[in-house]
């Protein structure tokens, strides 16, 4: 069989094991194939082994390691504007909620996004996605939530749909209209009813709804009513949960069968135990804790309880202006207690599971999409040690070499 591409001279081919989502102690189990080759045809991995099938193109990896293309399941692309001044405010002691209540935070980005054209959102988003691709991130979730009214929310969702067409990273959209209470509304219930009426229009762009369920934003009972409406319409559910305080949002995610509960920095033991016994994946975002100088989610406890854990960047203009996956993995290992094997599983197959893509992304296996990143390391175990200067040798997306260091 003649293939499109072969990758030879790989020191390690690293891939998660097990049926997704991979839970608890199984997250530390990786398939490590040493000194094997990969063959790709029609955008799919068709062979992994010692042979070198004839190919239209061959890459000599020169001892690099291969990981599945990384999957970032929680970002706030697309957005525009700059909130560097808020970073300085936080250094001077202002809290996230204090900045938000003063008209900064999410609402300042809302003003910028409402003014921006669709073209500007697409161009800004494409730039960020291209930079992420160079780091080996091949699939990214993006959210609305910086519009907070119908026209601007749909504009963000249109931008995500266009981004999925005009650049190489796969972009998976989520509706996060319930990100904050806009200035036009005084009553949260009234605003959530407004969003509920938008859902029929949103369905054209996404099958997933998210909400910022937090004390002072949308409380548990308010969130439950909105999410139940979305669920009744067939939407998959996600929650920003227990980020700033233990609010009950993580338990609500379990109750409603949400795909994920994200952040969980302030989740109590009872909440973590409930998540571990459910089908809800815990998403930890250590970059946000790092950026805000806050405590970190208890990733070690989540895994020890048996949860499926995913990692994500939370890339956004205010609380985490970071999209580097190797920094995120470093923080997961050094601050959240994960083993590097668990971090790899969390940023690949478990992340893909959240986006309903784990049947074709997040593993280097025959039949999976040929999304692969080659790193100039001796072993995957060097990722948290070398995180600030990892050489990305090549990125393969859908069987095409889309980035090469030379």
Curated annotation (Swiss-Prot):
Protein name as it appears in the record: Imidazolonepropionase
Family from the record: Belongs to the metallo-dependent hydrolases superfamily. HutI family.
Protein residues bound to N-formimidoyl-L-glutamate: 146, 316, 318
UniProt xrefs under InterPro entries: Amidohydro-rel, HutI, Metal-dep_hydrolase_composite, Metal_Hydrolase
GO cellular component, one term: cytoplasm
Residue numbers binding Zn(2+): 74, 76, 240, 314
Molecular function per GO: imidazolonepropionase activity; iron ion binding; zinc ion binding
BP-aspect Gene Ontology terms: L-histidine catabolic process to glutamate and formamide; L-histidine catabolic process to glutamate and formate
Claim: Metal-binding is one of the keywords in the record: yes
Listed Pfam families: Amidohydro_1
EC top class named in words: hydrolase
Catalytic activity from the UniProt record: 4-imidazolone-5-propanoate + H2O = N-formimidoyl-L-glutamate
Protein's job: Catalyzes the hydrolytic cleavage of the carbon-nitrogen bond in imidazolone-5-propanoate to yield N-formimidoyl-L-glutamate. It is the third step in the universal histidine degradation pathway.
Cofactor note: Binds 1 zinc or iron ion per subunit.
Recorded metabolic or biological pathway in which this protein acts: Amino-acid degradation; L-histidine degradation into L-glutamate; N-formimidoyl-L-glutamate from L-histidine: step 3/3
Binding positions for 4-imidazolone-5-propanoate per the UniProt entry: 83, 146, 179, 243, 319
E.C. code: 3.5.2.7
Positions contributing to Fe(3+) binding: 74, 76, 240, 314
Keyword Translocase included in the entry's annotation: no
Subcellular compartments: Cytoplasm
Membrane-spanning segments: none
Necessary cofactors: Zn(2+); Fe(3+)
Coiled coil regions, renumbered to chain: none
Keywords: Cytoplasm, Histidine metabolism, Hydrolase, Iron, Metal-binding, Zinc
């Amino acid at each position: 069989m003649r293939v499109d591409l072969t990758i030879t001279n790989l020191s390690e081919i690293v891939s998660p094991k097990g049926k997704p989502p991979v839970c608890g102690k199984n997250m530390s189990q990786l398939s490590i194939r040493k000194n094997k080759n990969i063959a790709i045809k029609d955008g799919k991995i068709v062979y992994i082994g010692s042979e070198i099938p004839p190919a239209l193109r061959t890459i000599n990896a020169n001892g690099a390691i291969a990981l599945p293309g990384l999957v970032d399941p929680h970002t706030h692309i697309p957005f525009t504007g700059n909130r560097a001044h808020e970073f300085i405010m936080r250094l001077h002691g202002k809290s996230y909620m204090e900045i938000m209540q003063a008209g900064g935070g999410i609402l300042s980005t809302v003003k910028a996004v409402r003014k921006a054209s669709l073209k500007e959102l697409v161009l800004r988003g494409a730039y960020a996605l291209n930079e992420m691709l160079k780091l080996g991130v091949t699939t990214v979730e993006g959210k609305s939530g910086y519009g907070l009214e119908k026209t601007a929310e749909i504009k963000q969702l249109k931008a995500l749909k266009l981004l999925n067409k005009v650049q190489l990273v796969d972009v998976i959209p989520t509706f996060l209209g319930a990100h904050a209470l806009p200035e036009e509304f005084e009553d949260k219930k009234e605003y959530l009813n407004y969003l509920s009426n938008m859902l029929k229009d949103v369905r054209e762009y996404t099958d997933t709804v998210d909400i910022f369920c937090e004390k002072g934003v949308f409380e548990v009972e308010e969130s439950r009513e909105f999410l139940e409406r979305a669920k009744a319409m067939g939407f998959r559910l996600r929650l920003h949960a227990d980020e700033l305080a233990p609010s009950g949002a993580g338990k609500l995610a379990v109750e409603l069968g949400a795909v994920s509960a994200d952040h969980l920095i302030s989740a109590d033991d009872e909440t973590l135990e409930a998540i571990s016994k459910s089908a809800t994946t815990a998403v930890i975002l250590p970059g946000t804790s790092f950026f805000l100088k806050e405590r970190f989610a208890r990733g070690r406890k989540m895994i020890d309880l048996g949860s499926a854990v995913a990692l994500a960047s939370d890339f956004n203009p205010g609380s985490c202006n970071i999209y580097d996956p190797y920094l995120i993995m470093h923080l997961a290992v050094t601050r959240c207690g994960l083993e590097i094997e668990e971090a790899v599983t969390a940023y690949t197959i478990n992340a893909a599971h959240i986006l309903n893509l784990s049947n074709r992304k997040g593993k280097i296996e025959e039949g999976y999409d040929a999304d692969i990143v080659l790193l100039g390391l001796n072993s995957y175990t060097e990722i948290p040690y070398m995180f600030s200067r990892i050489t990305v040798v090549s990125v393969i997306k859908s069987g095409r070499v889309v980035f090469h260091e030379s």
